[in-house]
Amino acid sequence: MAKQTPLYDQHVACGARMVDFHGWMMPLHYGSQIDEHHFVRQDAGMFDVSHMTIVDLHGNRTREFLRYLLANDVAKLTQPGKALYTGMLNESGGVIDDLIVYFLSEDYFRLVVNSATRDKDLAWISQHAEPYQVEVTVRDDLALIAVQGPQAQQKVATLLTTEQQQAIAGMKPFFGIQTGDLFIATTGYTGEAGYEIALPKQQVVAFWQQLLAAGVKPAGLGARDTLRLEAGMNLYGQEMDEKTSPLAANMGWTVAWQPEDRQFIGRAALERQRMKGTEQLVGLIMTEKGVLRNELPVYFFDAAGNQHVGVITSGSFSPTLGFSIALARVPAGIGEHAVVQIRNREMPVRVTKPGFVRAGKAIVL
């Protein structure tokens, strides 16, 4: 039977259509996915992301452990609260998961990992933590709400104490701080400003209701997906998985090659892939009528006139732009134009870098 977050009854009360999402009953939408999408882009929406897993790591060798476990380098994290995005790779360079890691103190780091990968993530982390004597604590006592949009931070501030407001004042993107019972982070999955807020489960219903009263509208998985796609953000299981290199998933920037003597899991395989070359993740735009969908083939000719084929990993109508967009994994050598086979029609598409909308504005036109 699918699990429920502490906010399940709140979703039902808000009119949500609930669906099974990787073993969790989650809201797909509350009546209109498009309206929810626009409200996040223009005002402030909130997502229940309590199905995600928060993992706290304690121990004197935690930083050393994470420098081995993760492809990005936590040595970059010198200011308490600072966070970074990274892949956690297997020995063949495939992505076990993508996650955010927060540096809270020298012997205390926090990870936020995906729900669909929870069991394998926890097994992998625990297995490799043991030699470093790092204590792994799964924070199932916490719920998690993402409040996103240009008015999100302003509306959240109305619910905070003076001390909490002062604690987060001027906090830059990709930081997190514990203030009172709230862990408030300037992270998100929409391309908008906002917070991701972890708090004790028994307090989350009241906090949700306060957000509603402050004019923050609930948004479901449908809007979350179109928002992250517009922002060019990966979804685990679509843009990458255990057989996909981060170099083929627009995650090359998350691999810290320096210093050269840092050995992290998957490094040797990645170095071979970097020498050999990999496929690449690109953006696609189709302004003609129709919708780009996952798994549709993408055809193009390289400079020598040879035809190649790739595949759409995520595709949808873009509510902000008013036409269809996609992310696609393609062989190297693609130019500015390609063709997507939709049923029996060959539809022309424009090739871009991943990422179509930032801070509510088109960045591809």
Curated annotation (Swiss-Prot):
Gene Ontology molecular function: aminomethyltransferase activity; transaminase activity
Q: Which reaction does it catalyse?
A: N(6)-[(R)-S(8)-aminomethyldihydrolipoyl]-L-lysyl-[protein] + (6S)-5,6,7,8-tetrahydrofolate = N(6)-[(R)-dihydrolipoyl]-L-lysyl-[protein] + (6R)-5,10-methylene-5,6,7,8-tetrahydrofolate + NH4(+)
Q: Does the keyword Protease apply?
A: no
The superkingdom listed in its UniProt entry is Bacteria
Q: Name one Pfam family in it.
A: GCV_T
Its GO CC terms are: cytosol; glycine cleavage complex
Which key words tag this protein in UniProt?
A: Aminotransferase, Transferase
EC number, UniProt record: 2.1.2.10
**Which GO BP terms sit in this record?**
glycine decarboxylation via glycine cleavage system
Q: Does the keyword Transferase apply?
A: yes
- Which class of enzymes does this protein belong to? transferase
Q: Which SUPFAM superfamilies match?
A: Aminomethyltransferase beta-barrel domain, Folate-binding domain
Kindly give the InterPro entries that the UniProt entry links to this protein. GCS_T, GCS_T_bac, GCST_C, GCV_T_N, GcvT/YgfZ/DmdA, GcvT/YgfZ_C, TrmE/GcvT_dom1
Query: Cross-referenced PANTHER family, in alphabetical order?
Result: AMINOMETHYLTRANSFERASE, AMINOMETHYLTRANSFERASE, MITOCHONDRIAL
Provide the family line.
Answer: Belongs to the GcvT family.
Q: How does it assemble?
A: The glycine cleavage system is composed of four proteins: P, T, L and H.
- Tell me, in a sentence or two, what this protein's role is: The glycine cleavage system catalyzes the degradation of glycine.
Tell me the NCBIfam families matching this sequence: gcvT (TIGR00528), PRK00389.1 (NF001567)
Write down what this protein is called: Aminomethyltransferase
Q: Which organism is it from?
A: Yersinia pestis
> What lineage does the source organism belong to?
Bacteria, Pseudomonadati, Pseudomonadota, Gammaproteobacteria, Enterobacterales
Q: Which gene encodes it?
A: gcvT
